[in-house]
UniProtKB/Swiss-Prot annotation:
Protein's GO biological process: acute-phase response; response to chromate; response to cytokine; response to estradiol; response to hypoxia; response to lead ion; response to lipopolysaccharide; response to methanol
RCL: annotated span: 367-386
Similarity remark: Belongs to the serpin family.
UniProt signal peptide: 1-24
Tissue expression notes: Plasma.
Domain of life: Eukaryota
Subunit architecture: Interacts with CELA2A. Interacts with ERGIC3 and LMAN1/ERGIC53. Interacts with PRSS1/Trypsin.
Compartments where found: Secreted
GO molecular function: endopeptidase inhibitor activity; identical protein binding; protease binding; serine-type endopeptidase inhibitor activity
Protein name: Alpha-1-antiproteinase
Length: 411
């Protein structure tokens, strides 16, 4: 009799909770090739960026009329961790689908780099609140391979929990409670249902809360039009302020580029295309341009209008990642024997959810008043009143934490 297939479950959760600031710096032209690439975690930052762009373009291909928001950091961490328990073509597909070239970087270096990157992101002394977590939920009768347990704990700081998957409601509650606690209540009931033959669950979350150095004044926020498309306009609370910004117009992208730094090591990059140029922006934007923007700051005065918004994205990663070449792990040919030798496993579900809130001050009130000098000449008005793209990156490594596209800030 052929062995039955038990199913593993992979869940991913991500949160971004923003409180705006501005930090302007003068910078000269810098060769991006001169960056210090010595730390271990820098070995994978370029791969993470490649994966972020690949996944973004796949999401645009599926729908160019919907908001997009996801955490490439969360997704790659979870699947890289899963690869530790995979073998043969299953492992090769996962790592190559995550944009790792195994002829250029040894697999051991990939996991070592994730280990150091997670340590960097979770620094307790950082002014930025950025926490990641990885949870392994194992059926109480399932025996995991000791080497797998050891490697995911050492490299990915994961926790292991014994769960009775025969009681699907209780198992679902344990998993959802873990995510809700890790994201400080921002993501609840992530897991709507469990397949009846689930015996293993892998959960990743990322929680981010950043504060702008110079918050917008809430008293200046006014309702204004946001042009979703040529025929659709919605009313949104529009923040505004006059000041000095890291901002310039990029003719290559036909877009305004705005960079806003957080207290700590993170930067938000917003790209506002000219009317009718969104597709051009999406086709032309590269990781090298992003790197150049971060290194070559251009400070100018402007009157900035920016919408308050709260968006989220929930994605079936089985569909998305299959389009990027990761297929075997989801079918009966999957080789996950590095996780358990008790029974064949395959990945039955892969869910990713990310949430973003952006407002004047964020979740913590700002008590400081900031006064800054601006040139006497009339500064330009830059209005983020139509669809735009943004990324939030960890400044030291330029690793993409979150990627998004705002089509309609009211949805």
């Amino acid at each position: 009799m052929a062995p039955s297939i038990s199913r593993g479950l992979l869940l991913l959760a991500a949160l971004c909770c923003l409180a705006p600031s501005f930090l302007a710096e003068d910078a000269q032209e810098t060769d991006t090739s001169q960056q210090d690439q010595s730390p271990t975690y820098r070995k994978i930052s370029s791969n993470l960026a490649d994966f972020a762009f690949s996944l973004y373009r796949e999401l645009v291909h599926q729908s160019n009329t919907s908001n997009i928001f996801f955490s490439p950091m969360s997704i790659t961490t979870a699947f890289a961790m899963l690869s530790l328990g995979s073998k043969g073509d299953t492992r090769k597909q996962i790592l190559e689908g995550l944009e790792f070239n195994l002829t250029q970087i040894p697999e051991a270096d990939i996991h070592k780099a994730f280990h150091h990157l997670l340590q960097t992101l979770n620094r307790p002394d950082s002014e930025l609140q950025l926490n990641t977590g990885n949870g392994l939920f194992v059926n109480k009768n399932l025996k995991l391979v000791e080497k797998f347990l050891e490697e995911v704990k050492n490299n990915y700081h994961s926790e292991a929990f014994s769960v009775n998957f025969a009681d699907s409601e209780e198992a679902k509650k344990v998993i959802n409670d873990y995510v809700e606690k890790g994201t400080q209540g921002k993501i609840v009931d992530l897991m709507k249902q469990l397949d009846e033959d689930t015996v293993f669950a892998l959960v990743n979350y990322i929680f981010f809360k950043g504060k702008w150095k110079r918050p917008f004044n809430p008293e200046h926020t006014r309702d204004a039009d946001f042009h979703v498309d040529k025929s659709t306009t919605v009313k949104v609370p529009m923040m505004n302020r006059l000041g000095m910004f890291d901002m310039h117009y990029c003719s290559t992208l036909s877009s305004w580029v705005l960079m806003m730094d957080y207290l700590g090591n993170a930067t938000a990059i917003f790209l506002l295309p000219d009317d009718g140029k969104m597709q051009h922006l999406e086709q032309t934007l590269t990781k090298d341009l992003i790197s150049r923007f971060l290194l070559n700051r251009q400070t100018r005065s402007a009157i900035l209008y920016f919408p308050k918004l709260s968006i989220s994205g929930t994605y079936n990663l089985k569909t998305l990642l299959s389009s990027l070449g990761i297929t075997r792990v989801f079918n009966n040919d999957a080789d996950l024997s590095g996780i358990t030798e008790d029974a064949p496993l395959k990945l039955s579900q892969a869910v990713h959810k990310a949430v973003l809130t952006l407002d004047e001050r964020g979740t913590e009130a700002a008590g400081a008043t900031v006064v800054e000098a601006v040139p006497m000449s009339l500064p330009p008005q830059v209005k983020f009143d139509h669809p735009f793209i943004f990324m939030i990156v960890e400044s030291e490594t330029q690793s993409p934490l979150f990627v998004g596209k705002v089509i309609d800030p009211t949805r």
